[in-house]
């Protein structure tokens, strides 16, 4: 590659997700529900429907009683090799093709299918029981005859449903009334969106004002709602009451909804049902995620195809050596049946059972408590990771915010000077309460102090008011909001919010004297240091979104009548909203370099007329059904101009325990770590340094902000000249580079020891994962804890979710769930490495077992003039791959080359695993040669040493074959487990005991002779001893790296 990257022509920007996705309407049409469209729902009158709606039945089953068996069998036989074995078994019904008893071919196939059917049946029964439990839950329905009980499955669109506290919401509803005095309720949404914080919901104002719930049936009103869709965070609709003069219309948003699957956390609520059954938000979001097929499974499938090719070739060669005489096509089929053992039918079952064992071992590991395996099909992926992509907040850090800095422009207050802030707040409210008489004139010092105190007070008051935090009072573990609020007791107050940052800010204002003690949908109460209660009316709230990066609130001070618009947000958006100043950008950078999360706080005083004009336009925009979000944003932006900058806040999110040694372990294991975060560049860089993601002796190249192709070209050329340096790039620059220089950028970035992407959107995180997979062909692992990490986790080859403060959404979407980032090291170094090596050994032994007996069959047929006559029949051929050898071979899933402590202490062992794969074409060829050697040795030895009868050949060869397999397993095991010993002895005992019942195939009197024993011993020794000698020499002169640590 040249030092200079040529200027590239414009490339079309790729879609963020190339996989086709069906929209909501297409989904509904496929389900038979017709085209989804908006609806009008009359309160309490389900018969007044303008279209048919699905029943409110939850059904997560894949099959029903009649389709279960056909469906399971179809899913199994759509795979070529399962269908191949079915055809072979069916061929035994044709007399010319029969080689022995029917059960010889049907029993192995039946066993494999039985395991699958039983597994599917258990899962289906579990789904049926869960669905029946949900569908049978009883609720109260308001009717003209009073309150009646109704099952969840019988609820219809238009019903008025009463949901009690701690009860699950049965359908998607509009919130009409609540029993809470504050006119709102809290919902627990962790089962819907994975977030553990409670969500505040507000009833329709018109219906909340009615005297009783029964009056809902006396008014003529309806809800106009948008068509069903999958968006759980937004809703557009209107409520209209026709029998009032004039008719009342209210806009409805997400704050007025009660989605099915959420749980009422406070009070009793009444709602009108909007969506049921398959149109529920929760059901429409329950889609099957991308099915991840492990790279190991793909490699095994490839080897199986090679074996199939060998099967066909050997069969054709056998017939060709007969010169295609007679009905040669029947002979080909007979040879395909004879050598069908070349393809091990039990391989998939063994590997699946092995994965179950790996998952069980991971869950039982006491050193990584709380780890959950949600996808048991890809544990081997953990042992082959080359790129780890991690979120920052809540993943590397604790997501426990600590207030560290208040900056007013001319003065900054840190932790050591918070007493000054407290004294300023105290002085303000002390002066107000004393209300001193007029003096001759304040001194200059007093004026300066009052000026500073008022600035501090305005900043603290803004922080105490501008948020979505609600104080919840608990007494003796039982929520008793009304009683506790009367006294505003500090001991039983808990803050509920969707963001840990907001809770940290409100807790800080409490520590300096201004405490949030009460809040409902229309008011807020603050308590001053003198225990005075300040009352504020909430006029409007503009919630935080990832797109806007800010939130705002308009409040009216009840004591003065002043209306104030407060806003806080990220510096990148607030810089264009606040009045011109010369310190915002510089101080934001300084605080970010200290690792602080910075928020900019501003305010704007509004005249009564100004607010009334805004409210009229805002209400009109909210009543719009089409493009509501755009119209509302336009109205809000009209206020967001020339706001007064009050302060900057800095909160610190400390690193989790043992993050530094974990990242060092991953780096030494040859895994490159990329940090993808939404934080600003300086904060992300500081965290990367503190976490030692970037080592002290590494340079950091901060990719300059680029906005077009030419700037990207120049910056990439500058970056190309750097060597062994970490890259830090913003999401905006990343988007430009990927648009014009995707290949060049990824090639350079992959050479970096570490990469930090800041201001990264969720879709960009997923795009980076996809590009790494496409450009490098290496396996990726994505780690995150929040909803914005889900797309990245699902896109990666192996997704790991961290259960954190932001909820369980990432954890539920991941393949593996951990409680702390430090557990990732053991998950990869120990369990990933062991799973990969064990599956490799298991698959090779299963293939070796099949090739050995197939080689013996080939030798036998060749000696007897290429006759298509089976060497072993009946129970011998079935028992060989089951009770005689299955347990020892499967016990390899318990083997390990080094202790767990050693694997953690020397992560270089993981790197060696990536370089020299335990399952490759080279190792496969070695095991093929071993199988051919041992099969030939056993068969020729038996033919040379047998005395007179054919049954002697069978007895000598089969016994030698069983002993060879058991010895090969014993020679391969590196760390003995007591179960391995039991498996070896049990298999040998089963064989010896079964000889009594195998007199049809084996001469029982012959095997008791000394002649039989020495012949079997010699053959077994010749087949195994050379391999043991080679293994010893290799270990002596070219030992593997792990052997140096175990010797």
From Swiss-Prot:
<dbReference type="GO" id="GO:0005886">
    <property type="term" value="C:plasma membrane"/>
</dbReference>
<dbReference type="InterPro" id="IPR032631">
    <property type="entry name" value="P-type_ATPase_N"/>
</dbReference>
<keyword id="KW-1003">Cell membrane</keyword>
<dbReference type="GO" id="GO:0016887">
    <property type="term" value="F:ATP hydrolysis activity"/>
</dbReference>
<feature type="active site" description="4-aspartylphosphate intermediate">
    <location>
        <position position="391"/>
    </location>
</feature>
<dbReference type="GO" id="GO:0005770">
    <property type="term" value="C:late endosome"/>
</dbReference>
<dbReference type="GO" id="GO:0055037">
    <property type="term" value="C:recycling endosome"/>
</dbReference>
<keyword id="KW-0225">Disease variant</keyword>
<feature type="topological domain" description="Cytoplasmic">
    <location>
        <begin position="355"/>
        <end position="841"/>
    </location>
</feature>
<dbReference type="InterPro" id="IPR001757">
    <property type="entry name" value="P_typ_ATPase"/>
</dbReference>
<dbReference type="GO" id="GO:0031901">
    <property type="term" value="C:early endosome membrane"/>
</dbReference>
<feature type="binding site">
    <location>
        <position position="678"/>
    </location>
    <ligand>
        <name>ATP</name>
    </ligand>
</feature>
<dbReference type="GO" id="GO:0005524">
    <property type="term" value="F:ATP binding"/>
</dbReference>
<feature type="topological domain" description="Extracellular">
    <location>
        <begin position="1000"/>
        <end position="1006"/>
    </location>
</feature>
<dbReference type="GO" id="GO:0005769">
    <property type="term" value="C:early endosome"/>
</dbReference>
<feature type="topological domain" description="Cytoplasmic">
    <location>
        <begin position="894"/>
        <end position="923"/>
    </location>
</feature>
<feature type="binding site">
    <location>
        <position position="392"/>
    </location>
    <ligand>
        <name>ATP</name>
    </ligand>
</feature>
<feature type="binding site">
    <location>
        <position position="789"/>
    </location>
    <ligand>
        <name>Mg(2+)</name>
    </ligand>
</feature>
<feature type="binding site">
    <location>
        <position position="677"/>
    </location>
    <ligand>
        <name>ATP</name>
    </ligand>
</feature>
<dbReference type="InterPro" id="IPR023214">
    <property type="entry name" value="HAD_sf"/>
</dbReference>
<feature type="topological domain" description="Cytoplasmic">
    <location>
        <begin position="1031"/>
        <end position="1047"/>
    </location>
</feature>
<feature type="topological domain" description="Extracellular">
    <location>
        <begin position="863"/>
        <end position="874"/>
    </location>
</feature>
<comment type="subunit">
    <text>Heterotrimer with MON2 and DOP1B; this complex regulates SNX3-retromer mediated endosomal sorting of WLS. Interacts with RAB5A and RAB11A.</text>
</comment>
<feature type="binding site">
    <location>
        <position position="788"/>
    </location>
    <ligand>
        <name>ATP</name>
    </ligand>
</feature>
<protein>
    <recommendedName>
        <fullName>Probable phospholipid-transporting ATPase IIA</fullName>
        <ecNumber>7.6.2.1</ecNumber>
    </recommendedName>
</protein>
<feature type="topological domain" description="Extracellular">
    <location>
        <begin position="92"/>
        <end position="96"/>
    </location>
</feature>
<dbReference type="GO" id="GO:2001135">
    <property type="term" value="P:regulation of endocytic recycling"/>
</dbReference>
<keyword id="KW-0991">Intellectual disability</keyword>
<dbReference type="InterPro" id="IPR008250">
    <property type="entry name" value="ATPase_P-typ_transduc_dom_A_sf"/>
</dbReference>
<dbReference type="GO" id="GO:0048471">
    <property type="term" value="C:perinuclear region of cytoplasm"/>
</dbReference>
<feature type="transmembrane region" description="Helical">
    <location>
        <begin position="97"/>
        <end position="119"/>
    </location>
</feature>
<keyword id="KW-0067">ATP-binding</keyword>
<feature type="binding site">
    <location>
        <position position="502"/>
    </location>
    <ligand>
        <name>ATP</name>
    </ligand>
</feature>
<dbReference type="InterPro" id="IPR023298">
    <property type="entry name" value="ATPase_P-typ_TM_dom_sf"/>
</dbReference>
<feature type="binding site">
    <location>
        <position position="391"/>
    </location>
    <ligand>
        <name>Mg(2+)</name>
    </ligand>
</feature>
<feature type="topological domain" description="Cytoplasmic">
    <location>
        <begin position="2"/>
        <end position="69"/>
    </location>
</feature>
<feature type="binding site">
    <location>
        <position position="544"/>
    </location>
    <ligand>
        <name>ATP</name>
    </ligand>
</feature>
<feature type="transmembrane region" description="Helical">
    <location>
        <begin position="304"/>
        <end position="325"/>
    </location>
</feature>
<keyword id="KW-0007">Acetylation</keyword>
<feature type="topological domain" description="Extracellular">
    <location>
        <begin position="943"/>
        <end position="949"/>
    </location>
</feature>
<keyword id="KW-1278">Translocase</keyword>
<feature type="topological domain" description="Cytoplasmic">
    <location>
        <begin position="120"/>
        <end position="303"/>
    </location>
</feature>
């Amino acid at each position: 590659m040249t030092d200079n990257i040529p200027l590239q022509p414009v490339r079309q920007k790729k879609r963020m997700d190339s996989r086709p996705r069906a929209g909501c309407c297409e989904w509904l049409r496929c389900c038979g529900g017709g085209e989804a469209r908006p609806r009008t729902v009359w309160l309490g009158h389900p018969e007044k429907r303008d279209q048919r709606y699905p029943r409110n039945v939850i059904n997560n089953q894949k099959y029903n009683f009649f389709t279960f068996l056909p469906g399971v069998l179809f899913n199994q036989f759509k795979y070529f090799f399962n269908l191949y074995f079915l055809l072979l078994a069916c061929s035994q019904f044709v007399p010319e093709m029969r080689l022995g008893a029917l059960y010889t071919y049907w029993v192995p196939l039946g066993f494999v299918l039985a395991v699958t059917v039983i597994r599917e049946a258990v899962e289906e029964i579990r789904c049926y029981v869960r669905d029946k439990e949900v569908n049978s839950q009883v609720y109260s329905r308001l009717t003209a005859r009073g309150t009646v009980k109704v099952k969840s499955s019988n609820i219809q669109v238009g019903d008025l449903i009463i949901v009690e506290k701690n009860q699950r919401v049965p359908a998607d509803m509009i919130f009409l009334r609540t029993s809470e005095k504050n006119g709102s309720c809290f919902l627990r949404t962790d089962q819907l969106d994975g977030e553990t914080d409670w969500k505040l919901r507000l009833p329709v104002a018109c219906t909340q004002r009615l005297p009783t719930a029964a009056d809902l049936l006396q008014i003529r009103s309806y809800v106009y709602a948008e068509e069903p869709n999958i968006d759980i965070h937004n809703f557009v609709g209107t409520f209209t009451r026709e029998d009032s003069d004039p008719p009342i219309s209210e806009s409805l948003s997400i704050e007025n909804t009660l989605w099915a699957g959420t749980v009422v956390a406070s009070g009793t609520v009444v709602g009108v049902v909007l969506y049921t059954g398959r149109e529920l938000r929760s059901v429409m979001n329950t889609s099957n995620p991308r099915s991840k097929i492990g790279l190991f499974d793909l490699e095994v499938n490839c080897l199986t195809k090679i074996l199939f090719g060998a099967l066909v070739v050997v069969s054709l060669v056998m017939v060709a050596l007969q010169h295609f005489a007679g009905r040669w096509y029947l002979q080909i089929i007979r040879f395909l049946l004879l050598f069908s053992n070349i393809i091990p039918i039990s391989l998939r079952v063994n590997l699946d059972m092995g994965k179950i064992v790996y998952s069980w071992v991971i869950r039982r590991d006491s050193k990584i408590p709380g780890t959950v395996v949600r996808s048991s099909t890809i544990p081997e992926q953990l042992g082959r990771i080359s790129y780890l992509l991690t979120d920052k907040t809540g993943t590397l850090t604790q997501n426990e915010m600590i207030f560290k800095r208040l900056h007013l422009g001319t003065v900054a207050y840190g932790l050591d000077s918070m007493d000054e802030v407290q004294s300023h707040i105290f002085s303000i409210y002390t002066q107000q309460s004393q209300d001193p008489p007029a003096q001759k004139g304040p001194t200059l010092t007093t004026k300066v102090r009052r000026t500073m105190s008022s600035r501090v007070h305005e900043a603290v008051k803004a922080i105490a008011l501008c948020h979505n935090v609600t104080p919840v009072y608990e007494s003796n573990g039982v929520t008793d909001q009304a009683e506790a609020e009367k006294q505003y007791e500090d001991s039983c107050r808990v803050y509920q919010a969707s963001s840990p940052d907001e809770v940290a800010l409100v807790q800080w204002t409490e520590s300096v004297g201004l405490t949030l003690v009460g809040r409902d949908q229309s008011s807020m109460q603050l308590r001053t240091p003198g225990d005075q209660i300040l009352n504020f009316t909430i006029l409007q709230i503009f919630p935080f979104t990832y797109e806007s990066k800010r939130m705002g609130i308009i409040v009216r001070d009840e004591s003065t009548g002043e209306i104030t618009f407060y806003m806080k947000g990220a510096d990148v958006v607030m810089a264009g909203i606040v009045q011109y100043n010369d310190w915002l950008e510089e101080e934001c950078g300084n605080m970010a370099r200290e690792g602080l999360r910075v928020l900019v706080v501003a305010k704007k005083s509004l005249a009564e007329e100004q607010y009334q004009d805004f409210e009229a336009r805002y209400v009109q925009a909210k009543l719009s059904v089409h493009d509501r979000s755009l119209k509302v944003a336009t109205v809000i932006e009209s206020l967001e101009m020339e706001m007064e900058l009050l302060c900057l806040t800095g909160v610190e999110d400390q690193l989790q325990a043992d993050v530094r040694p974990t990242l060092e372990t991953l780096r030494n294991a040859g895994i490159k770590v990329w940090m993808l975060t939404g934080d600003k560049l300086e904060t992300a860089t500081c965290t990367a340094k503190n976490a030692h993601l970037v080592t002290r002796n590494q340079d950091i190249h901060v990719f300059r902000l680029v906005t077009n192709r030419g700037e990207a070209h120049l910056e990439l050329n500058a970056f190309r000249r750097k060597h062994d340096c970490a890259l830090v790039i913003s999401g905006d620059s990343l988007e430009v580079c990927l648009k014009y220089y995707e290949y060049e950028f990824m090639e350079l970035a992959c050479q970096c020891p570490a990469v930090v992407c800041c201001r990264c959107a969720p879709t960009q995180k997923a795009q980076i994962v996809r590009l790494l997979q496409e450009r490098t062909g290496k396996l990726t692992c994505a780690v995150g804890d929040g909803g914005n990490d889900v797309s990245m986790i699902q896109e990666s080859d192996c997704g790991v979710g961290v259960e954190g403060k932001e909820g369980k959404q990432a954890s539920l979407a991941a393949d593996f769930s951990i409680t702390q980032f430090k557990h990732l090291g053991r998950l990869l170094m120990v369990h990933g490495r062991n799973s990969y090596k064990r599956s490799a050994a298991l698959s090779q032994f299963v293939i070796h077992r099949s090739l050995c007996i197939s080689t013996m069959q080939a030798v036998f047929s060749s000696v007897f003039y290429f006759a298509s006559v089976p060497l072993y029949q009946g129970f011998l051929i079935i028992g060989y791959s089951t009770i005689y050898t299955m347990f020892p071979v499967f016990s390899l899933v318990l083997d390990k080359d080094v202790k767990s402590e050693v694997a953690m202490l020397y992560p270089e062992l993981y790197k060696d695993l990536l370089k020299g794969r335990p399952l490759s074409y080279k190792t496969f060829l070695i095991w093929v040669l071993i199988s051919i050697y041992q099969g030939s040795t056993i068969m020729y030895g038996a033919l040379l040493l047998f005395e007179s009868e054919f049954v002697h050949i069978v007895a000598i060869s089969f016994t030698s074959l069983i002993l060879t397999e058991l010895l090969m397993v014993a020679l391969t095991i590196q760390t003995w487990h007591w179960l391995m010993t039991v498996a070896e002895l049990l298999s040998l005992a089963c064989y010896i005991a079964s000889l009594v019942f195998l007199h049809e195939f084996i001469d029982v009197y012959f095997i008791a002779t000394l002649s039989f024993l020495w012949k079997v011993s010699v053959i077994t020794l010749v087949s195994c001893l050379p391999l043991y000698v080679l293994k010893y020499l290799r270990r002596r002169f070219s030992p593997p790296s792990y052997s140096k640590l175990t010797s």
